[in-house]
Regions:
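Glycine-rich helix-loop-beta junction characteristic of Rossmann-like nucleotide cofactor-binding loops
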Residues: 76-83, 145-146
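Conserved class I S-adenosyl-L-methionine
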Residues: 82-93
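A short glycine-rich, Lys/Arg-flanked "PGG" loop and its adjoining helix->strand segment in the class I
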Residues: 162-179
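A basic, amphipathic helix-loop patch mediating RNA/tRNA/ribosome contacts
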Residues: 1-53
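S-adenosyl-L-methionine
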Residues: 110-163
Length: 247
């Protein structure tokens, strides 16, 4: 049996999930009765809540992790309709991307991750989600996952998207849309980072171009790139790239 996730202060959790830039902003929202947890208004920003609790912010969507905001930014920027789509989420982790897809109307999401027990209960229990834990995309059976997919999204760490690009056609059909989070810190050389952060914009741009080239070699045509609406760990600037499978 998995242990229940440790409770956190609400204001810390809201900042961690990318809902607010700092604790002061989160506090103001709580005091203004703009935050509900499990459908109940919270009176104190210091209240302890579960990381997988249903948190609602007045006037905007909320996701189980800050990754959802990144993908939502891409869907908005690329005018990407997800309604009715069969989707693959590579590196699902807590489920931020999957949550975003479900809220956007996806018919089904195959949530794949090499780890176990990270997916939020809200996502895990959704009938539209098929969970594939302890599963590496390099070894996954496309048919078992439900390929071909209409949309593939990916958010992984400690490995570059460029190195994974040759795998994506196995899960695609002509017209499959790909949206990937490019993390320059995992695409660049070690000596191009400063304590894990890529500070040189030229290096960051180069990594995006290299991912685009790898996707092109795999049969995808890149249609757009944006800077992520929120930064990654330690302030890393990240990017989202959209491509369409042509072959």
């Amino acid at each position: 049996m998995n242990k229940k996730p440790k409770k956190q202060r609400l204001d810390d959790l809201l900042v961690e999930q990318g809902a607010f830039p700092d604790r002061d902003a989160a506090l103001r929202a709580v005091m203004a009765r703009e935050v509900r947890v499990d459908d109940v208004y919270v009176a104190s920003a210091a209240q302890l809540v579960r990381p997988d609790a249903d948190i609602f912010l007045k006037g905007r969507k909320q996701f189980v992790s800050r990754g959802g905001r990144k993908l939502q930014g891409a869907l908005d920027a690329f005018s990407q309709d997800v309604a009715g789509m069969n989707c693959l989420d590579i590196g699902s982790s807590t489920g931020g991307f999957t949550d975003c897809l479900l809220q956007a109307g996806a018919a089904r999401v195959a949530a794949l991750d090499v780890n176990y027990g990270q997916l939020a209960w809200k996502i895990r229990q959704d009938a539209r989600v098929n969970v594939f834990e302890r599963t590496n995309i390099k070894e996954a059976d496309p048919a078992l996952l439900g390929a071909p997919f209409d949309l593939i999204v990916i958010d992984v760490s400690f490995i570059g998207l460029a190195s994974l690009a040759p795998l994506f056609p196995h899960f695609s059909r002509p017209g499959t849309v790909f949206i990937g989070l490019v993390k320059p810190q995992f695409e660049s050389a070690h000596d191009e980072t400063d304590r894990g952060v890529v500070r040189d914009e030229a290096v960051r741009r180069r990594t995006v171009e290299e991912v685009g080239a790898a996707l092109a070699d795999a049969g995808f045509g890149v249609t757009g790139t944006i800077e992520s609406p929120i930064t990654g760990p330690e302030g890393n600037v990240e990017y989202l790239v959209r491509a369409v499978f042509r072959k």
